[in-house]
C-alpha cells in the first residue's frame, strides 16, 4: 500500500506537466545537519534535481515544489568511556584495549529523498521574491555504513567498519517519511536560496530504539 501511494504521489506532478504552462526544472544542492534525539549532530549534503509547477488556476503565486535528490544523513554517539573491565562472556569483543578507552560510533545512511510540497511566492522587488513551502517527504534508503572508532588511554585511535550496509544488515528501516518546510528568496527567477527543516515521523531504527530523522537544511538551486 505504501509503495502504491508513493508511486501515485510521484506520478501526479508529471501527469500535470503535460498541460501546465508554468513548469520549471532546476538543479539543487546544499548542506544537511542531522540531529536525531540522543545523538550528536552530523553534517551531510543533498544534491539532485527539482521541479516547480505553478498553480495559477487556484491563485496567483501558489505552486507545487518537488524533487529527487541523493541525501546523506546520520549521527554520532556521544562517546562512551570504558575502564577496560569488560567481560567477553557477556558478548563484549575481546579485541578492545585492556586499559581504558573511548568508543565513538558513527552511522552515515544515504537516501533517495523525494519532497512534495505546496508553496507560495510573493514579489518584494523587481527581481526578488520570497517564498515558503511545506509538505511531506519520502526517503528510500540506498546504502550507508556504520563505523566505530576506539581511542585507548594509551595508544593510537583505530577505526573499523561495524556494518557494511545499514539497510541490508537489518540496522535501519529502508523507508522513511516525514514533514518539512522551506523558506527563502528567489533572485531574477533563476537563483533560489533557502533554509528549512525536516521532521521524520517514522522510527528508522529496527532495534526498537526511538530514532527519527531530524534535519536542518540549507539549499541553493538554479532554475532553468
Language-model region placement:
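Repeated loop/turn-to-beta-strand initiation elements of outer-membrane beta-barrel proteins
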Residues: 23, 58-62, 189-195
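Residues that define the transmembrane beta-barrel architecture of outer-membrane proteins
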Residues: 21-23, 41-47, 108-114, 128, ...
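Outer-membrane beta-barrel strand-turn architecture
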Residues: 53-59, 122-126, 187-189, 224
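Extracellular/periplasm-exposed beta-strand and loop segments of Gram-negative cell-envelope proteins
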Residues: 35-41, 73-110, 141-176
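Transmembrane beta-strands of outer-membrane beta-barrel pores
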Residues: 31-35, 53, 70-74, 110-113, ...
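Short glycine/proline- and aromatic-enriched beta-strand/turn motifs that initiate or cap beta-hairpins
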Residues: 19-54, 141, 150, 223
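Outer-membrane beta-barrel "beta-signal"
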Residues: 185, 212-224
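Membrane-embedded beta-strands of outer-membrane beta-barrel proteins
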Residues: 27, 47-51, 68, 114-118, ...
